[in-house]
A protein has these predicted regions:
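Active-site-adjacent substrate/metal-binding segments within catalytic domains
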Residues: 1-116, 122-131, 146-147, 170, ...
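A short, acidic/glycine-rich surface segment
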Residues: 13-15, 154-158
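Switch/coupling sub-region of P-loop NTPases
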Residues: 96, 157-160
Length: 269
């Protein structure tokens, strides 16, 4: 099975102004944790990253920079022609620039694109764009699978806007035990979706919990941790609780052979 992590291409104290050596150090840690797949979120990463992934035998999820909805306000207004042309161009550039890297297994056409589904009555202006991007990717590279990372607000099944069936494979961003719910919510999501779409492989593109270096506990159930800070108080995110979340979620994932790949969010913070 594909078990791995997602990562950004930044580095402590440097932001994006990183060197190839910084990337090598990051990928060495990816190897150390035993990952065999890497999600390069949420945009094209530097050529050196792909070169090293080729050499290390990692299976790469490469992603176009299409995040959230097609508008910042109401989701019942269609995407403009200019927007669609722009995101199509960026997907084509991603594929044409990185096509020759053997490590790449999937082209991701988007991340959490139903984020605006709760606005304006949950109108759908997203799936037409995603379907078009799938067509673009298959025209550019018929031999590789397309994918996307689906977000259902609150973690409730598919949500109002369904993106299943658009890409060859797909995956879920789910934060049970952190932003909402318990581990049984993930069980219901995965088993229910697999029963409904048994012919389309489903993965988990994001899961996890916050982990602050300065927060620790000897009772992971004594909490409660806080995903967000509040006025006058900072968030409380003990590392041990993050490890507990990973262990519980991973137990669910490992027991479901129909899950094609899983990615912890995130390898580096």
């Amino acid at each position: 099975p594909l078990r791995g992590v997602a990562m950004h291409q930044d580095y402590l104290g440097k932001g994006w102004a990183i060197t190839e050596r910084d990337t090598d150090e990051s990928l060495a840690l990816v190897h150390e944790v035993g990952a065999n797949t890497l999600r390069l979120a949420h945009y094209p990463h530097a050529p050196h990253t792909l070169q090293r992934a080729d050499e290390m035998g990692l299976v790469v999820w490469a992603e176009a920079p299409f995040v959230d909805g097609v508008r910042l306000s109401c989701s019942d207004q269609p995407a403009t022609e200019e927007f669609v042309a722009n995101v199509e161009q960026q997907l084509r550039e991603l594929i044409r620039q990185q096509y020759s890297h053997a490590s790449i297994a999937t082209w991701s056409i988007g991340n959490e694109n139903t984020m605006t589904q709760g606005r304006c009555g949950g109108g759908d202006n997203v799936t037409p764009v995603l379907r078009r991007l799938h067509e673009v990717a298959k025209a550019e590279d018929p031999g590789r699978a397309t994918t996307l990372a689906d977000l259902s607000l609150g973690g409730q099944g598919e949500g109002k806007i369904r993106v299943s069936g658009i890409t060859d494979v797909w995956a879920l961003n789910r934060y049970y035990m952190w932003y909402y719910g318990d581990v049984l919510g993930l069980v219901r999501d995965l088993d229910g979706i697999h029963a409904k779409y048994p012919r389309q492989p489903v993965g988990v593109s994001e899961y996890g919990a916050g982990a602050a270096l300065g927060d620790h506990t000897d009772n992971v159930l004594g909490g409660p941790p806080t995903p967000f800070g509040s006025p006058g108080a900072r968030a409380y995110q003990p590392e041990e609780y993050a490890a507990h979340v990973h262990e519980r979620i991973y137990e669910v994932l490992a027991s479901r052979p129909f899950v094609w790949g899983t990615y912890v969010w995130a390898m580096f913070d």
